[in-house]
Amino acid sequence: MKLPEIESFDLSQKRVLVRADLDVDLKENYRLKAILPTINYLIERGANILLLGHKGRPQGKDSLLSLRGVCGELANLLNKNINFIEEFPTMPPEGDLVMLENLRFNPQEESNGQEFAQALANLGEFYVNEDFAVSHRVHASIVGLPKLLPHAAGFRFRQEVENLAKVLTNPRKPVVVIIGGVKEDKITYIASFEKFADKILIGGRLPEFIQNNLNQKEIIATLLPDKEDITIHSIENFEEEIAKAGTIILTGPVGKFEEEGHRMGTKRVFEAIAKNQEAFKVAGGGDTVKAINLLNIAQSFDWISVGGGASLEFLAKGTLPGIEALN
């Protein structure tokens, strides 16, 4: 899948709007680090950068969901000053590195309001999408804005698409998908995954929401009585399938790994993935990444996506609204 590249444009002295992944926990700043190559590239090319992003799901303005703290952390990572703009500007703000306050403080961001998209476009001359994690949303800064300005995908955005696309295009067989976590809506993706997966291993709280096997490809874990982890028998079944896999997609822990007493399932399943050195291994989702880091096995994965829902949506549909907007 070919996306427009920032290297193809002369952006010197241009006002570049960067839709950045700023919805981060400051204790887990790996997602901020992921956008640094794009920002540094634009700085080196002499662009004037206006960073756009969101945090949480505010209902109007909410000081607890301000991006000011994120601005400070990103400034430290870049070792540069970032001018933080609290009120939405009517004119392009001065400075070569600027961040606007949480876009979701304006309800038109999430409703994809044309007026808001135009107001954003008036602040710049070029648009870069460097927020893969929210590109499954039809929001003004994701799909409205690139219709109004010349545009390209950021480096991380392109890497996300390239690596996730490998799973859909001639993957090494067999393909094993592990779905865990607590979000019931993940079940809706199973039918789509059946199109390319050979086995789908279902853990976490999801077995509670499945009445019976939908397909022979699925192995549904049995939960312990407290429902906080999967049984030893289920762990062994998962380990057996993982050992045979040529491609592994991991989305969600299989138990409440944050508590040591409920960590065995996640530990053994994740370590089984790490031990399979022949497979192409992809992981995604906030809790998945936390568990990977806790177990210190990040180096065993070929790709760790910054997208949770966006990764699932891409694997299910092969595209996202944010990708379509760039094309």
Residue ranges and their predicted role:
Residues M1-N327:
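Active-site loop-to-helix "anion-binding N-cap" substructures in soluble metabolic enzymes
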